Every structure is written in C-alpha cells, then in structure tokens.
Amino acid sequence: MFKEITPQQAWQLMIEENATLVDIRDEQRFTYSHAKGAFHLTGQSYGKFQIQCDFDDPVIVSCYHGISSRNVAAFLVEQGYDNIYSIIGGFEGWQRAGLPIETAY
C-alpha cells in the first residue's frame, strides 16, 4: 500500500531520506517545468528507474493534480516497491506550496 503525502512532506523526504521524486506528466509539461530533482517516469524510462531505485528506496509519485499518481503508486507497490508515496495535489500542489521547481525558461 502506498501513502498519500503533502508536497511539503514530499520535499522533506527528498531532503532527509534522499527520496526519488518521479513525475509522470507528459514530456512537454515535464520539460517546461517540474519539481527540482524530479525523474521523468514513462514507459520508456521505467527500465532506467528500476536500475536507479532499489525496492526499499523511498519513491514519491507526482502527476498533474494528484489523481493519476495514485494508479502509478499502486503499480509500483505491485512491482515490489515497499516505500511508495503519492503527492496530494500533484505538481499543481507542489507549485502552490512554493517548493523548488526547474524550468526550461
């Protein structure tokens, strides 16, 4: 089972536990702006993700508004990952919280 956490809790996990934040939004939106340090998780990048993240590493899933990330978080749990989180409010919530982002502009 995955846990839902606030954007602030996600940022804290990234700092304190070196959690990996994966962004599942489309390529164009991810390239335009994303949470600082986010990994763009797609069907094509899943193999790279598996190499980078161990099953017990903390992984945080982010999408647009916090809905789609739940499905991906559940999928990762089914694949054997133990420490999975979904951001409440997604990237929109991350931005509203004023947390660090990286942009293409």
Swiss-Prot record:
Enzyme class: transferase
Catalytic reactions on record: thiosulfate + hydrogen cyanide = thiocyanate + sulfite + 2 H(+); thiosulfate + [thioredoxin]-dithiol = [thioredoxin]-disulfide + hydrogen sulfide + sulfite + 2 H(+)
Primary localisation category: cytoplasm
PROSITE patterns to which the protein is assigned, alphabetical: RHODANESE_3 (PS50206)
UniProt cross-references to InterPro entries, sorted A to Z: GlpE_sulfurtransferase, Rhodanese-like_dom, Rhodanese-like_dom_sf, Thiosulf_sulfurTrfase
Active-site residues (renumbered): 63
Domain (Rhodanese) ranges: 15-103
GO MF terms, alphabetically ordered: thiosulfate-cyanide sulfurtransferase activity
Alphabetical list of SUPFAM superfamilies matching this protein: Rhodanese/Cell cycle control phosphatase
Assigned protein family: Belongs to the GlpE family.
Function, in words: Transferase that catalyzes the transfer of sulfur from thiosulfate to thiophilic acceptors such as cyanide or dithiols. May function in a CysM-independent thiosulfate assimilation pathway by catalyzing the conversion of thiosulfate to sulfite, which can then be used for L-cysteine biosynthesis.
Protein name stated in the entry: Thiosulfate sulfurtransferase GlpE
Organism annotation: Mannheimia succiniciproducens (strain KCTC 0769BP / MBEL55E)
Organism lineage string: Bacteria, Pseudomonadati, Pseudomonadota, Gammaproteobacteria, Pasteurellales
